[in-house]
């Protein structure tokens, strides 16, 4: 497998968005996970998020991608409050997505149907959609398994699919 050249959907206006949390809090039941968290990740920088199990790392990723909403505070991307912005709009506008550790696929759909389903949300132009799908299938070496249901893929094949879906 070779290196995959990154590409951006042409509609992305923000190629390197900044991400900021302002007084973000979230709890699961009575258990606070994040309490008035403040930070900013500037454009064109790389950061790692480290901490023990249960520290809130995955929760922060879910908040950034829109899979969770904070109980309090704001999440800004390029100084725009995206706290209430749906997941698909964050992906379409900013190119922000999340590759889950487990799951992340439609288990009863084939690999190619998984890619088609997600690309219809993100890429409006049908020709561009098919071009991107074919590119990903080729680069991730998925050609021989594109018609197999996700639930029947190996763990590594499923991980490749979740990377393609992100």
Task: Provide a role label for each language-model segment.
Residues 19-21, 34:
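Conserved structural motif at the start of ABC-family nucleotide-binding domains
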Residues 149-153:
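Conserved ABC ATPase signature
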Residues 65:
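Helix-to-loop junction immediately C-terminal to a conserved catalytic motif
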Residues 81-97, 102, 126-130, 147:
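ABC ATPase NBD coupling module
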Residues 50-52:
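The feature captures the beta-strand-to-loop junction immediately N-terminal to the Walker
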Residues 73-81, 92-94, 137:
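Conserved ABC transporter NBD signature motif
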Residues 29, 47, 85, 113-128, ...:
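ABC-type ATPase nucleotide-binding domains, specifically the catalytic core motifs of the NBD
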């Amino acid at each position: 497998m070779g290196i995959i050249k990154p590409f951006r959907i042409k509609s992305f206006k923000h190629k390197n968005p900044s991400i900021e949390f302002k007084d973000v809090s979230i709890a699961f039941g009575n258990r606070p996970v994040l309490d008035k968290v403040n930070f900013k990740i500037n454009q064109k920088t790389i950061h790692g998020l480290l901490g023990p199990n249960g520290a809130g790392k995955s929760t922060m990723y879910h908040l950034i991608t829109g899979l969770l909403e904070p109980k309090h505070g704001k999440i800004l991307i390029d100084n725009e409050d995206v706290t209430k912005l749906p997941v698909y709009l964050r992906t379409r506008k900013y190119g922000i997505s999340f590759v889950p550790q487990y799951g992340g696929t439609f288990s009863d759909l084939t690999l190619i149907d998984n890619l088609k389903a997600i690309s219809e949300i993100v890429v409006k132009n049908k020709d561009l959609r098919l071009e991107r799908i074919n590119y990903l299938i080729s680069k991730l070496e998925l050609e021989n398994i594109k018609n197999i249901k996700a639930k029947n893929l190996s763990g590594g094949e499923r991980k490749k699919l979740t990377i393609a879906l992100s």
